[in-house]
């Protein structure tokens, strides 16, 4: 057989040759250093046979793909270590049943059904066993079995692997990887790829936690235990990640939401349904007020639509039944003699479309920008719900722009300006844009070819004019139009997808939307979907973690706490708090019978931006002693001076304090 090297040179090899044979043919240096290969653009290990005529580029430990290889093998090492862990506890290793063990971002996991529950306390012992397996430098071997042989290996022993074998299409190769010998090693059903031996795995890994995971993500299937690990090429990368992990725990919005009394998810109310507590609602209302001001200034018209709609509305839009799995079931009143069925609103767009369509529209009215803080409902599986970032009911800062094809670029520029204003106001400085365009080889897209080409060109031109750093992702467009979204890094360097802007040719067509053009003829408008925050719940969850609950003054639930030194200043403290409130600040006087230092500490724990201490001197002078969170004591100043500065900081939505 013939394969081709990166420089185009052919290499003759025996039939069934692997990348290992390529390395051997290229000399001792490559044979020693090679860990895998890129074969026709796909990641291979050294063990998988190469196709005839393949283009082969060998990989070493310096290549970024090495990380994928060793993380995958670490998942197998984890499974082997768990089996050995239970063998030493007196269990038959066969009693440990295995689900799947893939590579994930930063590491790996394995889903396991063990004879007794695993806990985080077991992880150091399992991790120690993994390190032993690395030191043994067990070579990996790949082999293929027939369907019957593969089923015989698992049937009656491991229902999860049996199910996976049965799902492999007829005629597709069923491969296994074995590390060590059959008796004391480990063999797993796997497509690969892997490192050549366990000794090639860098020792810079750590098991992080154990969590429950339903088999195949289905809450009606057995609950397995998912053991997570992280792994890196260098000790420095691992150290940095573990620091980030600890910092992320401190910033976890679920923990801070509880401690700062921002929100609540009550099981009696329902899973994934958020109760905003008074302090959390302040953050929500401030964000909405900011967005409302910006939208009105930019020519949006605010509308309100109901939380449910007729099933026919969503059949017309195509949201039902195509997305039925992510929706709550229809609401029926047939037993009351009413034929019409309803659906909890999964999207705001059909409602806005009906507002557009209630009368004839002229080109003079376009672009028409309709905006709403609309609450929608999606059915998320219980196991996938996560604090504010994955919920079943959420509010979107949703808007839909109806415009002519020629106006798409201008509207895109307007939305980009709004999104960038949001990012700047909240201190989100590190971001990049992605433009999703058609895959020219696919025929899944609706709409006119010329309109698509125009929209894609207009989006790229708008992104360039806005000075954005962007990439064009071929095939990332939705079937109904191209899009642009942002990937934003938070304070910990984690990436979040925000601020999607979507061009839509499909819904105007489905609803028969028209406008009368300059020529007196009817034309089809283009529709833009945009939501800079996206879900308010998710956005606030991200902000809580980005700021570590330490919000800038304009978002802080309590902006100032007045602390009297003793009982003698309590009336003055209340007077100061009253004046702050009258001026529009959120202020409280803390007159509890606690030591002054304890009250100051409590305000700091609650992350209140300003603590105003008042004693006899301050009372006599009409002043306050100002402490700014993270900056300490700023000295004494007249109350009027503090009020003027604090109001400026609040009204201008400053990130940094004025004092």
Curated annotation (Swiss-Prot):
Residues 234-548, 252-552 are annotated as: Catalytic. It comes from the Bacteria. Coiled coil: none annotated. Residues 1-60 form the TGS domain. This is Threonine--tRNA ligase. Its main location: cytoplasm. The lineage of its organism: Bacteria, Thermotogati, Deinococcota, Deinococci, Thermales. It is found in: Cytoplasm. PROSITE patterns: AA_TRNA_LIGASE_II, TGS.
């Amino acid at each position: 057989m013939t394969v081709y090297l990166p420089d185009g040179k052919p290499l003759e090899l025996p039939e069934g040759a692997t990348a290992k044979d390529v390395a051997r043919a290229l000399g001792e240096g490559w044979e020693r250093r090679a860990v895998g290969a890129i074969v026709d653009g796909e990641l291979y290990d050294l063990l998988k046979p190469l196709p005839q005529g393949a283009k082969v580029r060998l990989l070493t430990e310096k290549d970024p793909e090495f990380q994928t290889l060793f993380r995958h093998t670490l998942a197998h090492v984890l499974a082997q270590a768990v089996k050995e862990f239970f063998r030493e506890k007196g269990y038959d290793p066969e009693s440990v049943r295995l689900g799947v063990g893939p590579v994930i971002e930063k590491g790996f996991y394995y889903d396991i059904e063990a004879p007794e529950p695993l806990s985080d306390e077991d992880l150091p012992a399992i991790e120690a066993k993994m390190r032993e397996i690395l030191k043994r430098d067990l070579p990996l071997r790949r082999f293929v079995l027939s369907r019957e042989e593969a089923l015989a290996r698992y049937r009656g022993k491991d229902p999860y692997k049996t199910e996976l074998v049965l799902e492999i299409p007829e005629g597709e190769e069923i491969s296994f990887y074995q590390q060590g010998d059959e008796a004391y090693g480990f063999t797993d059903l796997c497509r690969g790829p892997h490192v050549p031996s366990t000794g090639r795995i860098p020792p810079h890994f750590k098991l992080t936690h154990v969590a429950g995971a339903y088999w195949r993500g289905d809450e009606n299937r057995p609950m397995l235990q998912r053991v997570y690990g992280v792994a890196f090429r260098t000790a420095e990368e691992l150290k940095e990640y573990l620091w980030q992990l600890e910092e992320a725990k401190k910033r976890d919005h679920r923990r801070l939401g509880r401690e700062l009394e921002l929100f609540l998810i009550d099981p009696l109310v329902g899973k994934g349904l958020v109760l905003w507590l008074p302090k959390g609602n302040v953050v929500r209302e401030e964000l909405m007020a900011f967005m409302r001001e910006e939208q009105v200034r930019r020519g949006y018209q605010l509308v309100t639509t109901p939380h449910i709609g007729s099933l026919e509305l969503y059949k017309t839009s195509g949201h039902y039944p195509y997305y039925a799995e992510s929706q709550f079931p229809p609401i029926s009143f047939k037993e009351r003699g009413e034929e019409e069925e309803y659906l909890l609103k999964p999207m705001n767009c059909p409602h806005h479309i009906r507002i557009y369509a209630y009368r004839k529209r002229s080109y003079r009215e376009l672009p028409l920008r309709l905006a709403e803080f609309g609450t929608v409902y999606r059915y998320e599986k219980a196991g996938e719900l996560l604090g504010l970032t994955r919920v079943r009911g959420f509010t979107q800062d949703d808007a839909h722009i109806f415009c002519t094809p020629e106006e798409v670029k201008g509207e895109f520029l307007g939305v980009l300006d709004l999104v960038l204003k949001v990012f700047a106001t909240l201190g989100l400085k590190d971001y990049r844009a992605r433009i999703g365009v058609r895959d020219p080889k696919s025929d899944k897209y609706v709409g006119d070819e010329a309109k698509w080409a125009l929209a894609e060109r207009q989006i790229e031109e708008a992104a360039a004019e806005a000075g954005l750093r962007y990439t064009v992702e071929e095939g990332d467009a939705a079937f109904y139009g191209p899009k642009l979204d942002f990937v934003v890094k938070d304070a910990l360097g984690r990436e979040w997808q925000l601020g999607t802007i979507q061009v839509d040719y499909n819904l105007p067509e489905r609803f028969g939307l028209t406008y009368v053009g300059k020529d007196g003829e009817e034309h089809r408008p283009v529709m833009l979907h945009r939501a800079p925050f996206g879900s308010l719940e998710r956005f606030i969850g991200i902000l809580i973690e980005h700021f570590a609950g330490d919000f800038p003054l304009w978002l802080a639930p309590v902006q100032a706490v007045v602390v009297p030194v003793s009982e003698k200043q309590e009336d003055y403290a209340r007077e100061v708090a009253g004046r702050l409130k009258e001026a529009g600040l959120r202020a409280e006087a803390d007159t509890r019978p606690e030591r002054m230092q304890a009250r100051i500490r409590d305000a700091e724990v609650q992350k209140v931006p300003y603590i105003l201490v008042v004693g006899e001197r301050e009372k006599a002078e009409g002043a306050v002693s100002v402490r700014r969170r993270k900056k300490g004591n700023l000295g004494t100043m007249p109350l009027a001076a503090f009020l003027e500065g604090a109001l400026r900081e609040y009204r201008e939505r400053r990130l940094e304090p004025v004092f």
